[in-house]
Structures are given as C-alpha cells and as structure tokens.
Amino acid sequence: MKKYFDKVYKEGMERFQKELYDRLIYDKKTFIITANPETLMTGKENREFDSILCSKNSIITPDGIGVVKGANQVGYHVKERVTGVDIVKYLFSILDKEGRSLYLFGAKPDIVNTLAKKVSDKYPGIQIVGTVDGYVDDKDAVFDDMAIKKPDVVLVALGIPMQEIMINRHYHKFDKGIFIGVGGAFDVLSGMKKREPHFFVNHNLEWLYRICSEPKRLKRFYRSNIKYLDEIRKMKRNMR
C-alpha cells in the first residue's frame, strides 16, 4: 500500500487543474488513474494492474475520501479529493475553450451517445472524434482508431481494472493525449444517472448514498474496504 500512497497526488484540485491545463496545451501525454480504496485493493490482487499503478507513466488521484484519510493516517499529507467527475468536467471546459478534440469509449450505447450529444450541445468548441460503446467485440481496434485520430483527451469507461489495462496496452502508440479511466462516470455525466445529492458529496458520503440506492454494491464495498482498513492498521502498527 505504501508504494501507492507514495504516488497519490497530494496537492489538491486547484493545483491539479493548473497542471492538467499545461499538459493539454503543451501536448504532454498523460495517464490518470482515479483511485478509491477498491482501486488500490484491486492493485494488491492483480499483478498487471499493480504494475500500472506503480508505473512512471501513471498519475494516481485520490478520488475516494478513504484514500485521503487512509494516506493521512499513515504519515502522508493528501490535501483533498481529486475526483474523476470533477477532472472530466474541467477538461470539458478547457477543450471547449481551446477547440481541442475528445474521444469517448465505454458504457452502454445509449449512455455514451447521450453523453456525446450533451457534450456537443453544452461545449460546441469540442471536436468529438470518436464515440464507441463498451460492448464492441474488438476493443483493441478502438485504440487503433484513436491512434489515427490523435485525440487530445480520451475517456475510457470500461470499469477497473479493464479500462486501465486497455489504456496501458496501447499507450505507446500515442505521442500526446490525456487518458483517463472513468468507471461509471459516463452515467452521471450523461445525465442518465443523477450524481449524489449535495449533502452526501459535501460530506464525502457518496459511498453511503450508492449503497442505499444500490444494495447489491454492499458486498463488494464491504469486502474491499475491510481489506483496505486492515492494510492501514498494519501500516500504523509498523510506524510505532
């Protein structure tokens, strides 16, 4: 767990936005992984994903409050959450302003198509060069298409760890571009699924709202977070 916390972005959203802007403007290739405790525990259990999390190519942002609090309890200073949804919304604004291009890959057909239309309507300056759902048989071919079109931002919604594995597999084909695995963010960004109410967001309780709304999440949440808390306890004991 320490090697993940060493890499987690610690400076907060405002600073990250400035760095993202520079990376976009100067065409600096970037691979962002937005992490909650389940993400980090998947890395502990999946060797390929572990190598991606630890790679010098990737930036890990603290999407979940559990990552912020866990890291801070074992001697790190992570300022605040830097969430995938907020990163994407910021990227939409600067893509629109700068007239840059976007590729959307993942989720169900109706969701990704609705998102593409919503982005086009709200951000007319964005050039959407690809809209592909996550149910295509040949996902590698989608990345070949991206390599031809050279988008400035690529959003991949295939779920962890598949989205990161696919990005990593094809990352060498690109000279530029900001690549982000966004999980279920297309559902929220498209408006097909409402983001958690402000109370839950402001108090970092989105996880509670999701469990109440979708009880089937409870088993997965419980399993990954109990293991994560155990990792934090072990690290704290070793600090004594």
Model regions and ranges:
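A transmembrane-helix-recognition feature enriched in membrane-embedded lipid enzymes
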Residues: 66-71, 195-240
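N-terminal nucleotide/polyanion-binding subdomain common to many enzyme families
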Residues: 1-80
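Short glycine-rich anion-binding loops that position phosphate/pyrophosphate groups of nucleotides
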Residues: 36-39, 158-163, 185
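Conserved beta-alpha
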Residues: 68-145, 149
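Short Gly/Thr/Asp-enriched flexible loops that form oxyanion-binding sites at enzyme active sites
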Residues: 116, 164-173
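A short helix->loop->beta-strand "cap" motif at the edges of active sites that frequently abuts
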Residues: 29, 100, 174-178
